């Protein structure tokens, strides 16, 4: 056995033999991150962060640069794949009680916030119609902050409206934040290696562990291969599946799109924002839709870690999944009845998961005690 192989295998923790496919999404996320950084680097070489040239430079990349269309589409579709994997990764954590490993969960939530900021800045860079107006709407939310809001917005914009300085700083932030994501990912993985992975049963894995390599590493490779295959199928046959048609027009501050919306992976948060008629209230709800994930390690009441043996909590979990899909769907629709009512109802359901789950955990404990 080579020295390199010994070094690799000696640093890989043994893992519980019963972990399922849901445990493969961490390695898939790492693959997405590497792919995004590589494609992003090649795109940055040809991109021009200027409001008069940005849109043309993206067209130049797709038309004139050799394999530029592959790089551009890989980067755009790869971002969607990144968010699909991260949402499944979070759902797995909620279902199997992985949030009880507090340090790993809190570092992961910080990673999610950084990732969302990076994706938002990236969406603005092509300087299409939807890029411009989505940036205007979202950055304008800062004005809801009492006393400091207007000053913060002007500081972020680099002027009194979204203009050339805004695009320049958004490009700088979009370029630098992935390095912060690499650092946070390293911290996330190091913290995970303190205790090691949990398993679907939520029990201690020490009695039944197997080497990570080759058993789980090959399993990871299978899922990564499936993900990359799916990515290239979309890239080859449906490259504009996840794009907004409005973004094929250059940004025009004088023409407002009929329906302003961000990328699909932000629609659940945008739907929560729109469901509240008050600007400050909507901004707070938008922030809380992500930040509330940080409360889960401190509100767990059940004696059982995983939801696998808790039918009441399972019902709440699947209600949350359906709610997430419903909010995403309603956020694509105009602000008019019945979508306003649906949006408000689903927002209540979304937040009720984080309130009801601790109460259900307490109820389940009582039922178990009665049976004993």
From Swiss-Prot:
Example GO molecular function term?
metal ion binding
Task: Tell me the cofactors it needs.
Answer: heme b
GO biological process terms held by the UniProt record: mitochondrial electron transport, ubiquinol to cytochrome c
What's an example GO cellular component term for this entry?
respiratory chain complex III
> CDD domains of this UniProt entry?
cytochrome_b_C, Cytochrome_b_N
Q: Where in the cell is it found?
A: Mitochondrion inner membrane
In what way does this protein cross or attach to the membrane? Multi-pass membrane protein
* SUPFAM superfamilies attached to this UniProt entry: a domain/subunit of cytochrome bc1 complex (Ubiquinol-cytochrome c reductase), Transmembrane di-heme cytochromes
One family from Pfam that matches here is: Cytochrom_B_C
* Ranges annotated as spanning the membrane: 25-45, 69-90, 105-125, 170-190, 218-238, 280-300, 312-332, 339-358
The record's listing under PROSITE patterns reads: CYTB_CTER (PS51003), CYTB_NTER (PS51002)
**Gene3D superfamilies the record matches:** Cytochrome Bc1 Complex, Chain C
Where is heme b b562 annotated to bind? 75, 174
Q: How is the cofactor bound?
A: Binds 2 heme b groups non-covalently.
* Protein residues bound to a ubiquinone: 193
Keyword Transmembrane tagged: yes
Its keywords, alphabetically, are: Electron transport, Heme, Iron, Membrane, Metal-binding, Mitochondrion, Mitochondrion inner membrane, Respiratory chain, Transmembrane, Transmembrane helix, Transport, Ubiquinone
UniProt family annotation: Belongs to the cytochrome b family.
Q: What does this protein do?
A: Component of the ubiquinol-cytochrome c reductase complex (complex III or cytochrome b-c1 complex) that is part of the mitochondrial respiratory chain. The b-c1 complex mediates electron transfer from ubiquinol to cytochrome c. Contributes to the generation of a proton gradient across the mitochondrial membrane that is then used for ATP synthesis.
What this protein is called in its record is Cytochrome b
In its UniProt entry, the species of origin is given as Aspidelaps scutatus
């Amino acid at each position: 056995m080579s020295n390199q192989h010994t070094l690799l295998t000696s640093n890989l923790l043994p893992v519980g033999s019963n972990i399922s496919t849901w445990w493969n999404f961490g390695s898939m996320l790492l693959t997405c991150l590497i792919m995004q950084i590589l494609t992003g680097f090649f795109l940055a070489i040809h991109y021009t962060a200027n409001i008069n040239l940005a849109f043309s430079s993206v067209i130049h990349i797709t038309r004139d640069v050799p394999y530029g269309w592959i790089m551009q589409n890989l980067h755009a579709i790869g971002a969607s794949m990144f968010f699909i994997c991260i949402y499944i990764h979070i759902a797995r954590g909620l279902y199997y009680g992985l949030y009880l490993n507090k340090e790993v969960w809190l570092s992961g939530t910080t990673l999610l916030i950084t990732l969302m900021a990076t994706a938002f800045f990236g969406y603005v860079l092509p300087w299409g119609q939807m890029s411009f107006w989505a940036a205007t709407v979202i950055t304008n939310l800062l004005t809801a902050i009492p006393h400091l809001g207007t000053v913060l917005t002007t500081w972020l914009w680099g002027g009194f409206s979204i203009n050339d300085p805004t695009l320049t700083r958004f490009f700088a932030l979009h370029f630098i934040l992935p390095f912060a994501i690499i650092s946070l990912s390293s911290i996330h993985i190091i913290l995970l290696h303190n205790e090691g992975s949990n398993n679907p049963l939520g029990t201690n894995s020490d009695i039944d562990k197997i080497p990570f390599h080759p058993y789980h590493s090959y399993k990871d490779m299978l899922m990564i291969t499936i993900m990359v295959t799916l990515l290239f199928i979309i890239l080859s046959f449906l490259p504009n599946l996840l794009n907004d048609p409005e973004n094929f027009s250059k940004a025009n501050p004088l023409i407002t799109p009929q329906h302003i919306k961000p990328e699909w992976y932000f629609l659940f948060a945008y739907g929560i924002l729109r469901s509240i008629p008050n600007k400050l209230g909507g901004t707070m709800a938008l922030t809380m839709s992500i930040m509330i994930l940080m409360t889960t390690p401190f509100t767990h009441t059940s004696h059982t870690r995983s939801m696998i043996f808790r039918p009441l909590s399972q019902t709440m979990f699947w209600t949350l999944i359906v709610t997430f899909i419903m909010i995403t769907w309603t956020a694509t629709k105009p602000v008019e009845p019945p979508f306003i009512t649906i949006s408000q109802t689903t927002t209540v359901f979304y937040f009720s998961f984080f309130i009801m789950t601790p109460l259900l955990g307490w109820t389940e404990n009582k039922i178990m005690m009665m049976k004993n």
